[in-house]
Amino acid sequence: MISDLVDYLHNNLLIAYFCGFDISRPLPSYWTFDRFLKNFDNKVLSEIMKTQVLFLSKEGIVDTSFIGLDSTPVSANTSQNNPKSFLSNKFKPRNQPRADSDCKLGVHTASNQTNEKKYEFYWGYKNHVLVDCISGLPIYEMTTTAEVHDATVALDILAATHSFQPITDCTFLADKGY
């Protein structure tokens, strides 16, 4: 994931500039982003997001009358997630990756077609995001380990969001996992 970010920023210097990077100098390396993610307190980012949502709501940009919730897999940076790895036991629950001792074994559908039953296993996490469907902007996010089922966190996400932004009179959209 960090490699993708570094590649994206190098290939989209305008985005890098808008993110605050001085594009006349070398962009941060993989290891700089890795160190940042490991050492930075997620609570700070959550508080910044909350402040931005409240500001955008006050400005009329975020409207919580129509909200949606979905999750996406976040693969851990481990060789066991490498499709070129042919280890027979790479997706056994007792074969925890040494590179990331916090990640868990998860499964996600490899296709959005209802008649296809393709599943992929992965070691990692899940990012659950509540969005304002009108603007498309995120309102709240929660990252869990990959084995956590979507339905078990839905009420927590809605309650946490409602603690700072009222969402009682809204239309709620989610997939069958919730």
Could you describe each region identified by the protein language model?
Residues I2, Y8, P26-Y30:
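Generic structural signal for well-ordered secondary structure
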Residues S3-F21, V53-L54:
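DNA-recognition alpha helix
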